[in-house]
């Protein structure tokens, strides 16, 4: 341990114990804090920072800029600065610092990541699979349910038979934060779910899971990802197929057709409308593409 880390580390360790014991944060979260603060201590040593008590706003900005030069992206920088702010707030509460020097420091904004989707024709191409065995029927049902209801992968694999009402076409799923919600499946998804359920007993089910592996146990998320990717290749779909892409496609196509952002929010199970609003950017991209292709005075680069 260097002279600098010997003076910086004890308070970091005390903060981590506080997070673990008093805040009762998960070991994974505490490990994340440790990783970020250890990296900051290393950079601080390079800057000649000997004590947290001497840290000022200029040095905080230097910590951020050096982290950026080390290759951290904006989202990772924001995470690192957030960990530092929390630590410094704790130092303020302990009387070590009079104020938090990171309070007014911001990180570079990250570009908004737009989820990729596939168009309706590509979806239809993907779903027109050759039903030559029970597993193919199962996969078709999973694809139809994923696209028909816009489910998360965890929600799909977590579906149980008791959660589905085929008569009404509804299913109860367990979303993020263990929040249940009821979503409509749509007629096509219900039809293919019925086809699969008629074959499900062939796999000698070991629990109430709707979708089973060939062992009779609940299918794993990894298996679903693998099967979807394989079907994308077999069907000649132009982009890599993964479950989240079908969820994004569901959201985009619903918004393009209805324009009802609140309804899409409810269907996706988003706690905040802000999360759903990213699809308005996708919808605008769609409109802009149509405009550029159709409007007589929208020819770019021409006068």
Swiss-Prot record:
UniProt xrefs under PROSITE patterns: CB, TYR_RECOMBINASE
Regulation: FtsK may regulate the catalytic switch between XerC and XerD in the heterotetrameric complex during the two steps of the recombination process.
Any single GO CC term annotated in Swiss-Prot or TrEMBL for this entry: Holliday junction resolvase complex
Coiled-coil annotated spans: none
Keywords: Cell cycle, Cell division, Chromosome partition, Cytoplasm, DNA integration, DNA recombination, DNA-binding
Compartment(s): Cytoplasm
Any one GO MF annotation of this record: DNA binding
GO BP of this protein: cell division; chromosome segregation; DNA recombination; DNA transposition; resolution of DNA recombination intermediates
Residue span(s) of domain Tyr recombinase: 113-292
Active site location: 152, 176, 244, 247, 270, 279 (o-(3'-phospho-dna)-tyrosine intermediate)
PANTHER family: PHAGE INTEGRASE-RELATED, TYROSINE RECOMBINASE XERC
Subunit structure, interactors included: Forms a cyclic heterotetrameric complex composed of two molecules of XerC and two molecules of XerD, in which XerC interacts with XerD via its C-terminal region, XerD interacts with XerC via its C-terminal region and so on.
Similarity-based family: Belongs to the 'phage' integrase family. XerC subfamily.
Role this protein plays: Site-specific tyrosine recombinase, which acts by catalyzing the cutting and rejoining of the recombining DNA molecules. Binds cooperatively to specific DNA consensus sequences that are separated from XerD binding sites by a short central region, forming the heterotetrameric XerC-XerD complex that recombines DNA substrates. The complex is essential to convert dimers of the bacterial chromosome into monomers to permit their segregation at cell division. It also contributes to the segregational stability of plasmids. In the complex XerC specifically exchanges the top DNA strands.
Protein name, UniProt field: Tyrosine recombinase XerC
Species of origin: Yersinia pestis
Lineage: Bacteria, Pseudomonadati, Pseudomonadota, Gammaproteobacteria, Enterobacterales
Encoding gene, per UniProt annotation: xerC
């Amino acid at each position: 341990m260097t002279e600098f880390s010997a003076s910086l580390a004890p308070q970091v360790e005390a903060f981590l114990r506080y997070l673990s014991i008093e805040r009762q944060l998960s070991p994974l979260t505490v490990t994340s804090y440790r990783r970020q603060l250890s990296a900051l201590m290393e950079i601080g040593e390079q800057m000649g920072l000997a004590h947290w008590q001497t840290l000022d706003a200029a040095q905080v900005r230097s910590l951020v800029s050096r982290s950026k030069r080390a290759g951290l992206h904006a989202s990772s920088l924001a995470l690192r600065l957030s960990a530092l702010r929390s630590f410094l707030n704790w130092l303020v509460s302990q009387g070590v610092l009079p104020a938090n020097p990171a309070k007014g420091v911001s990180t570079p904004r990250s570009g908004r990541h737009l989820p990729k989707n596939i168009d309706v024709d590509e979806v239809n191409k993907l779903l027109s699979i050759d039903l030559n065995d029970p597993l193919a029927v199962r996969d078709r049902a999973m694809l139809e349910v994923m696209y028909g209801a816009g489910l998360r992968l965890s929600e799909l694999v977590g579906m149980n038979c008791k959660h589905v009402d085929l008569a009404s076409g509804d299913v109860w799923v367990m979303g993020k934060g263990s929040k249940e919600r009821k979503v409509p499946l749509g007629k096509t998804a219900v039809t293919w779910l019925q086809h699969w359920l008629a074959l499900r007993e062939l796999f000698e089910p070991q629990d109430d899971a709707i979708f089973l592996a060939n062992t009779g146990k609940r299918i794993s998320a990894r298996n679903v990802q693998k099967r979807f990717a394989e079907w994308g290749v077999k069907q000649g779909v132009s982009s890599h197929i993964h479950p989240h892409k079908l969820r994004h496609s569901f959201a985009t196509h619903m918004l393009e057709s209805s324009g009802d952002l609140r309804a899409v929010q409810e269907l996706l199970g988003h706690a905040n409308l802000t999360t759903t609003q990213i699809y308005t950017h996708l919808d605008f991209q769609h409109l802009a593409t149509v405009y550029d292709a159709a409007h007589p005075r929208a020819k770019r680069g021409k006068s």
